[in-house]
């Protein structure tokens, strides 16, 4: 009998064309599917919670797949990590109900954007931080953040190519911390448009450089015009940190759950 398994996956996106399997480039999804096929002897297709772009990283990507293999769910990290490159790690495996869907059942996501605000950059952090060599006005950046909170039409915060049916989104939390020369932005919401977090980060950088006023986000909500906001920040500063699901999504039928009790 087929079971549905949910994996939690961490990856450094530097070497990859993104999460989603593509014809031109090596994707994270492809490598995990190939490892699963070897492990189970089945042709496996996985569905991810977020289709991260080339160069974007993940600490908490989630993906589900169906299998008739009797490999215990908690053993998948051990099995798959022996086959995967070191920049992709499976951190957890769980059995979920047949109706669970990693992408369509999400109720929120948290993203982290990292900025290195130093003159000369960093050899060690070059792939995980966006480097800004000019001093940023962090106070001005923080002043702009609360405007994003709540439910708004984020049409101006979507890059061309976005296919969302609605641009109404709810941002539940924003936070900016400074640790030495590192500026860390956290954004959490119910869902995000294409390149939305990178556009927010790019606008904050321009606010920090005094190229845009701190009310740029307010203006964008008024005009719904992409030109009201800053450039899209580089992909390598972005990380998908956590994916949230409603508690009921994990409730297993008694016949399946009994062996866990």
Per-region residue spans from a language model:
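Structured-RNA-binding interfaces characteristic of tRNA pseudouridine synthases
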Residues: 1-261
């Amino acid at each position: 009998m087929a079971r549905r398994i949910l994996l939690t996956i961490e990856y450094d996106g530097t070497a990859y064309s993104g999460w989603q399997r593509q014809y031109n480039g090596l994707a994270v999804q492809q490598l995990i599917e190939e490892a699963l096929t070897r492990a189970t002897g089945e042709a496996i297709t996985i569905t991810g919670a977020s289709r991260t772009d080339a160069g974007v990283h993940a600490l908490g990507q989630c993906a589900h797949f169906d299998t008739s293999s009797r490999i215990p769910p908690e053993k998948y990290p051990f099995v798959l990590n022996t086959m995967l490159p070191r920049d992709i790690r499976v951190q957890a495996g769980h059995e979920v109900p047949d109706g669970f869907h990693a992408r369509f059942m999400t109720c929120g996501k948290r993203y982290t954007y990292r900025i290195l605000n130093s003159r000369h950059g960093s050899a060690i952090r070059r792939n995980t931080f966006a480097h800004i060599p000019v001093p940023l006005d962090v106070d001005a950046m923080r002043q702009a953040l609360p405007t994003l909170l709540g439910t708004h039409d984020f049409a101006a915060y979507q890059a061309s190519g976005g296919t969302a049916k609605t641009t109404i989104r709810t941002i539940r939390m924003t936070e900016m911390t400074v640790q030495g020369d590192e500026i860390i932005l956290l954004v959490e919401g119910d869902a995000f448009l294409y390149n939305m977090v990178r556009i927010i980060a790019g606008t904050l950088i321009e606010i920090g450089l005094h190229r845009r006023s701190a009310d740029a986000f307010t203006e964008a909500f008024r005009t719904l015009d992409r030109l009201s906001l800053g450039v899209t920040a580089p992909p390598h500063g972005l990380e998908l940190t956590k994916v949230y699901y409603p508690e009921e999504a994990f409730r297993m039928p008694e016949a399946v759950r009994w062996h866990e009790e």
